A protein has these predicted regions:
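C-terminal lobe/tail of nucleotide-utilizing enzymes
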Residues: 1-10, 180-302
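Short, hinge-like loop/turn segments at secondary-structure boundaries
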Residues: 63-67, 157-159, 236-238
Length: 302
């Protein structure tokens, strides 16, 4: 069986883990948008949902499949898997089962995908730590709130200076250290701050934390209701902004969401290959020709 430490080895997909112990930070929304963005770039994408209780990413993808069939449209779909949490009486047995399930999925798809996007639960669990250990990039979305920042750092209430490292940040640092030990790999950790009008002080604290821990701090998306409206239909801000796709004419909020999401994905600097871009261009050309009406000389027969 493939050992977990080999998942990130040569010939394996580039692994992006979406993680934060704070619920409601937008992990699943980010995971879905990233997967669709990579698919639109012609990359072969696998997704794994490690939150077997909420199953947010699993339901998001299933909604997308149902919506595409209902609207009779083509929507990019990742190769998706759900890892169930073991519920036995013995912790060691549970971890062995979860490791086997995780490794089994990776073994089955590692040669079929270029990227693997993993959505994690908002709890410190074995699967959560395992995913971070094999990550090439960790994305941590946070809202502009000192309450949400608590999983990353403790902050002085007067000066807003960082005074300590939070539990989740310690877990990521441990994963980075262990990763260096077994394959000299580097985990690129990016904290994505979702923007609000009140978040300037939070931004300063995250920047200070970045200097301490060697993480990248990028500005994310605004808090828009439209992101929550995407879930029932499985759509994203990166899908075609037309009535055929959405079932209604998209508004200005859709266009703004698309623009800011494209900017965010660009900031991540993921290794998107030229081969994938050529694949995306060919797919786009094929789809355009399939939708175009036939020329009259191709219809009439002498």
């Amino acid at each position: 069986m493939l050992h977990a430490a080999q998942i990130a080895g040569a010939g394996s997909p580039y692994v992006v883990v979406i993680g934060n112990e704070k619920g409601g930070s937008g992990k699943t929304t980010l995971a879905m948008h990233l997967a669709v963005a990579l698919l639109k770039e012609g990359q072969r994408v696998g997704t794994i949902d490690l939150d077997s209780n909420q199953r947010g990413l699993t339901r998001y993808i299933e909604n997308r499949r149902i919506w595409a069939n209902h609207r009779r449209i083509e929507l990019e779909m990742p190769l998706h898997h759900l890892v169930l949490r073991a519920e036995g009486a013995k912790l060691r047995d549970n971890e062995a089962k979860e490791l086997a399930a995780f490794e089994g999925i990776i073994s089955g798809i590692r040669k079929s995908v270029d990227f693997l996007v993993i959505d994690t639960p908002s709890t410190d669990a074995y699967l959560m730590r395992l995913a971070h250990l094999v990550a090439d990039t960790v994305l941590t979305p946070v809202t502009d709130s000192f309450l949400d920042l608590g999983t990353l750092a403790s902050v002085d209430p007067v000066t807003h200076e960082v005074t300590g490292t939070g539990h989740y940040a310690e877990m990521v640092c441990e994963a980075r250290m262990r990763r260096r030990q077994f394959d000299q790999g580097h985990i690129d950790w990016i904290v994505i701050r979702n923007r609000s009008a009140r978040g300037q002080l939070v931004g300063h604290s995250i920047t200070e934390l970045g200097i301490r821990l060697g993480l990248r701090d990028v500005e994310g998306c605004a808090e828009r209701i439209v992101y929550r409206q995407f879930f029932p239909s499985g759509l994203t801000a990166l899908d075609a902004l037309d009535e055929a796709t959405f079932g209604a004419i998209p508004g200005q909020s859709h266009r703004l969401a698309q623009q800011e999401m494209r900017i965010l994905i660009g900031f991540l600097n993921l290794p998107i290959g030229e081969r994938g871009r050529r694949r995306a261009a060919a797919r786009k050309e094929w789809y355009a020709s399939a939708q175009a009406p036939l020329e009259i000389d191709k219809v009439l027969i002498d």
